[in-house]
């Protein structure tokens, strides 16, 4: 764990957000995708067994909470990091053995999303026998097997002559390996259960042809700018500084990041606590910079500017240690989009993020969405988290935050709030 960010606000008390960003390295000519190809090729289930945990986990994540709905929370699945590590190593070995045609994890909506998306991306169909799905509970229905979100599971399409090799690899890593179906050319999803057809539907309406929401947006004006000259000066600069330093929003995050190992494999160059985390590409002098950023109070005050600011800050932080940003990802955390004011926050934030990405010539390569973050009708502060990855050619040229000698100059770059047209930008002050 080499970096991160923490924000506090009472609106998160009922919906605590945890956004995680994982970054890895891959050979550009050995990237495996999720498009199923080859009618007749076997569809393989790999990983942990399927249980009833996590059923409707995605649905639960798309609902407001209240005291009456508190009982829904236990539907969230429980991860098993050790099994996850075994599954990761097995997948890498399977890929190295040239057995894999397509692969996708079973995330939200479990086997439903992975099978439908893989078949759709390949322009084909899929048939599966749910009686063959490894289950850890008895009597699971087709509905439960398809919607379970039990963790540490993968769905793969393998080369027909590679099944035995793949089975041996998975058994070596103590993982379930089960052929549960095949790729078809029908453009349909067919599910068998107890010897009967439980489902036979076209794929297109579930994926590309699914209806899109066009929700109404409220006209929410941005907050008026408060000029620095208009701020009451009821306290001394010293008292103001003490109050700011006592704020949880500015206090050290050491109590959080020291609970995690930031030095695994001894390649960490810039540990947590700086502008960006920096790790060495193992066995080389190149480095990868990683950062996540968002200031929710900015987004609440002006969604479009706040969304742009999240991208801009994520872009600035790698440059502050000497790295050059490559691309961003995002996780859009908002309240109930069925409410016009929340939908306006979401839409305007995305527009602002796009504005900044185009100006900075930065691609957005992936993303995630977490909506309906409300409890008893109170929405969270809008929080479009932006993750940035950058590179540095020589880690020896990386720059830290600490001064390195006496007499060095302190320089402020950018607009100064003390200027005539300066403003405090929703600062904590």
What function would you assign to each model-found segment?
Residues 2-429:
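Glycine/proline-enriched, intrinsically flexible loops and inter-domain linkers
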């Amino acid at each position: 764990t080499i970096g991160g960010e923490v924000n506090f606000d009472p609106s998160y008390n009922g919906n605590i957000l945890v956004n995680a960003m994982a970054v890895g390295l891959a050979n550009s000519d050995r990237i495996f995708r999720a498009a199923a190809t080859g009618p007749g090729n076997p569809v393989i289930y790999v990983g942990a067994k399927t249980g009833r945990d996590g059923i409707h986990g995605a649905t639960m994540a798309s609902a407001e909470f209240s005291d009456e709905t508190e009982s829904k929370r236990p539907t969230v699945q429980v991860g098993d990091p050790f099994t996850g590590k075994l599954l990761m190593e097995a997948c890498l070995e399977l890929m190295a053995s040239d057995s894999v045609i397509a692969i996708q994890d079973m995330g939200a909506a479990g086997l439903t999303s992975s099978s439908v998306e893989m078949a759709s991306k390949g322009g084909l169909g899929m048939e599966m026998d749910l009686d063959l799905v490894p289950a850890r509970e008895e009597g699971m229905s087709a509905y439960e097997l398809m919607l379970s979100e039990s963790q540490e599971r993968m769905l793969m399409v393998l080369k027909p002559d590679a099944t035995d090799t793949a089975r041996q690899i998975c058994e070596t890593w103590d993982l379930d390996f089960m052929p549960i179906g095949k790729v078809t050319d029908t453009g349909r999803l067919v599910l068998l259960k107890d010897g009967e057809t439980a489902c036979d539907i076209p794929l297109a309406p579930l994926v590309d042809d699914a209806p899109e929401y066009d929700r109404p947006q409220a006209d929410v004006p941005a907050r008026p700018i408060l000029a620095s000259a208009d701020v009451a000066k009821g306290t001394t600069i010293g008292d103001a500084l003490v109050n700011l330093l006592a704020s949880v929003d500015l206090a050290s995050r050491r109590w959080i990041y020291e609970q995690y190992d930031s030095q695994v494999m001894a390649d960490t160059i810039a540990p947590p606590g700086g502008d960006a985390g920096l790790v060495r590409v193992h066995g080389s002098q190149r480095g990868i910079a990683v950062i996540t950023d968002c200031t929710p109070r900015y987004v609440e005050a002006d969604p479009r500017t706040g969304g742009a600011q999240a991208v801009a800050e994520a872009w600035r932080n790698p440059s502050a240690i000497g790295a050059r940003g490559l691309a961003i990802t995002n996780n859009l955390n908002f309240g109930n989009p069925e409410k016009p004011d929340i939908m306006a926050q979401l839409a305007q934030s995305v527009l602002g993020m796009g504005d900044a990405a185009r100006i900075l010539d930065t691609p957005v390569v992936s993303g995630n969405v977490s909506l309906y973050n409300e409890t008893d009708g109170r929405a969270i502060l809008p929080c479009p988290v932006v993750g940035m990855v950058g590179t540095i050619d020589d880690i020896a040229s990386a720059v830290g935050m600490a001064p390195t000698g006496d007499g060095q100059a302190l320089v402020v770059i950018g607009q100064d709030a003390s200027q005539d047209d300066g403003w405090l930008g929703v600062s904590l002050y």
